[in-house]
């Protein structure tokens, strides 16, 4: 065989093997000898692409062409030559459209030479899809989570139904049960989350001495009989001692029997270092009903006096004589001197999603003070009040502190 023919033969063999080497494939190197038939095996591995959208993974398996075998017969001259194998590309990228958001998937490759396909989902944010149910459209929003980033699924129902947000911390591939989900209602319009309060000095001169400075060493709780005074034009409400708003994630600290005010935000340390004698705290908020049921208000540790109003009169018109709940510090023959006030009050039966106006006035005379409360029902159990509290709803809001009462004049009848 002359040199030209030999070179041409080697070139064709190499070109043949090059054509049979494909992405992700492997081929063996063989020695070609005279008068001998040899086989070169070219094989491609199987690739599996996993697409995940929402909670239902979809798996697509891509099979290469079957393994090919080719017989090559050489001339009588003995020689050997390497088979050219193209190495696997390091990264294969495929762009897929999900809704209106592009994202890139990469697929782990298999074979002798490894390749990695990176999965790049949209930057943490939201993907929104509008769905129509009957004649009422509603929107579902999926906020994508990764690692320890908090993930949220918000379901916005038609406006005549309430909305629920299920939120929790999730890992990239973790699924958590409903028992770990915190259920917090979401406003169906422009409601503002929060529970407002204001703290005042007690300055009603006609009863201050009996309430704040008792002569016999014991506060006269019945001397505090004008709760609507805290909401009148006669009381200077322009400069309360403290004001604040509890957010939906704040817990209301229990005001256990103490010489000091409770540590409410945003000035918790200042309040906690202020003596509570002769002080009044006013609370106002809308309670959003989580489930249709009959609800009860439970108050504990009342020291010294508590008044409560529910419904529209809690926004404007509350008076000294139309309160819905009342409790006070008192002695109990069965429990001994110093028993604090407590009580359960039926608020009423309300439908899911209803915003109930609520107003409390809590006053402490001499010595230590205290107050604690929560709402409950058979279907929900005790509620975390701030998780269901709003400073205003789509159609209603509270007046500034110091406005809106409906009956300053005329004290309450003495209760015993």
Swiss-Prot record:
Entry keywords, A to Z: Glycoprotein, Repeat, Signal
GO CC field: external side of cell wall
Domain PA14: from-to ranges: 224-390
Intervals holding Sequence repeats: 90-124, 125-160
Stretch forming the signal peptide: 1-27
Locations listed in the record: Cell surface
InterPro entries referenced in this protein's UniProt entry, alphabetically: GLEYA_adhesin_domain (IPR018871), PA14/GLEYA (IPR037524), S_pombe_Mam3/Map4 (IPR051905)
Main localization category: other
Glycosylation sites: 19, 344
Region (2 X 36 AA approximate tandem repeats): 90-160
GO molecular function, one term: cell adhesion mediator activity
Gene Ontology biological process terms from the UniProt entry: flocculation
Family: Belongs to the mam3/map4 family.
Function: May be involved in agglutination during conjugation or other aspects of colony formation. Induces flocculation when overexpressed.
Protein name, as recorded: Putative cell agglutination protein pfl6
């Amino acid at each position: 065989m002359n040199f030209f023919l030999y070179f041409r033969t080697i070139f064709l063999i190499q070109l043949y093997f090059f054509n049979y080497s494909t992405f992700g494939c492997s081929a063996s190197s063989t020695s070609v000898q005279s008068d001998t038939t040899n086989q070169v095996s070219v094989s491609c591995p199987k690739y599996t692409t996993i697409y995940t959208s929402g909670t239902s993974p979809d798996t697509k398996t891509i099979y290469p062409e079957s393994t090919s075998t080719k017989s090559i017969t050489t001339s009588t001259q003995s020689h050997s030559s390497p088979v050219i194998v193209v190495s696997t590309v390091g990264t294969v990228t495929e762009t897929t459209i999900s809704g209106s958001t592009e994202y890139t998937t990469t697929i782990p490759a298999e074979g002798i030479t490894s390749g990695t396909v990176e999965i790049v989902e949209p930057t943490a944010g939201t993907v929104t899809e509008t769905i129509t149910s009957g004649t009422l459209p509603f929107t579902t929003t999926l906020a994508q989570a990764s690692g320890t980033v908090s993930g949220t699924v918000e379901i916005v129902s038609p406006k005549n139904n309430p909305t629920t947000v299920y939120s929790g911390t999730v890992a990239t591939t973790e699924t958590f049960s409903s028992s770990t989900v915190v259920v917090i209602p979401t406003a169906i319009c422009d409601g503002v989350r929060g529970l407002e309060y204001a703290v005042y000095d007690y300055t009603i001169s006609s009863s201050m001495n009996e309430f704040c400075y008792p002569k016999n060493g014991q506060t006269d709780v019945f001397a505090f009989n004008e709760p609507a005074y805290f909401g009148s034009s006669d009381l200077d409400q322009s400069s309360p001692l403290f004001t604040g708003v509890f957010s939906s994630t704040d817990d209301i600290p229990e005001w256990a029997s103490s010489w000091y005010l409770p540590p409410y935000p945003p000035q918790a340390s200042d309040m906690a270092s202020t003596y509570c004698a002769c002080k009044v705290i006013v609370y106002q908020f809308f309670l959003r009903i989580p489930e249709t049921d009959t609800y009860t208000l439970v108050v504990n540790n009342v020291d010294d006096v508590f008044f409560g109003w529910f419904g529209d009169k809690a926004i404007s018109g509350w008076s000294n004589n139309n309160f819905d709940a009342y409790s006070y510090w008192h002695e109990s023959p069965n429990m001994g001197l110093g028993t604090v006030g407590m009580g359960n009050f039926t608020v009423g039966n309300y439908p899911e999603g209803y915003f109930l106006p609520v107003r409390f006035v809590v006053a402490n005379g001499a010595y230590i003070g205290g107050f604690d409360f929560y709402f409950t029902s058979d279907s929900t159990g005790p509620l975390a009040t701030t998780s269901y509290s709003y400073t205003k709803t789509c159609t209603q809001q509270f007046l500034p502190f110091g406005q809106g009462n409906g009956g300053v004049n005329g004290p309450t009848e003495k209760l015993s």
